Amino acid sequence: MDFVKALLDKKLLLIGNFMLTSGKVSPYYLDLRKLPNHPDIFSFVVSSAVDIVKGINFDMILGVVTGGVPFASFIACKLNKPMGYIRAEKKGHGTERLLEADVDGKKVIVVDDVATTGGSILKAVEEVRKAGGKVEHALVIVDREEGAFEKLESVGIRLLSVYKVSEILNSLIKSNLVAENEKKLISDYMVKNIGKS
């Protein structure tokens, strides 16, 4: 499967001017929250993710709301592992918990869709550890390579990814799928941001 072409065709990779959760402005945006709307691509990505984590010794998978939840659910189902999720902030009703899982004494893999600086994953890891869980691995579909790997490594977490954004963007730049001015914007952004933490 030509993943980059599929991302563009399904408008999951957008070119323009986008504000990221991290506060950075980017010339591209990966809208992976819509990936489950496309079962062929979603299934391909989930199978790739399963191949990455199946050799790891862990007890459960925890999805980061909202982007990580569909991936965590399907990966957990394929591996017959329990699954939970973690919110960014407490809801104002019900149990008012951030963490919807019993992680005490369990080895947990935290799953999200995309990592930029690693802030969302780090917050999830901290909550899991506070609740007695052990986290040594996090998995994302795409690592934007803007510091998440290093930030997580500094707290003992190995960040795994199905794709590195440099692979996606280099493929995009080499293709005829985007205009020359868009290729330049992306290339300039890569030089300034990717691999610089």
UniProtKB/Swiss-Prot annotation:
Any one GO molecular-function label of the UniProt entry: magnesium ion binding
Binding, 5-phospho-alpha-D-ribose 1-diphosphate: 87, 91, 93, 112-120
Xref: InterPro entries: OPRT, Or_phspho_trans_dom, PRibTrfase_dom, PRTase-like
Enzyme class, broadest EC rank: transferase
SUPFAM superfamilies linked to this entry: PRTase-like
UniProt pathway annotation: Pyrimidine metabolism; UMP biosynthesis via de novo pathway; UMP from orotate: step 1/2
EC number: 2.4.2.10
Reactions accelerated catalytically: orotidine 5'-phosphate + diphosphate = orotate + 5-phospho-alpha-D-ribose 1-diphosphate
Record flagged with keyword Magnesium: yes
Subunit comment: Homodimer.
Family from the record: Belongs to the purine/pyrimidine phosphoribosyltransferase family. PyrE subfamily.
Protein name per the record: Orotate phosphoribosyltransferase
Organism per entry: Sulfolobus acidocaldarius (strain ATCC 33909 / DSM 639 / JCM 8929 / NBRC 15157 / NCIMB 11770)
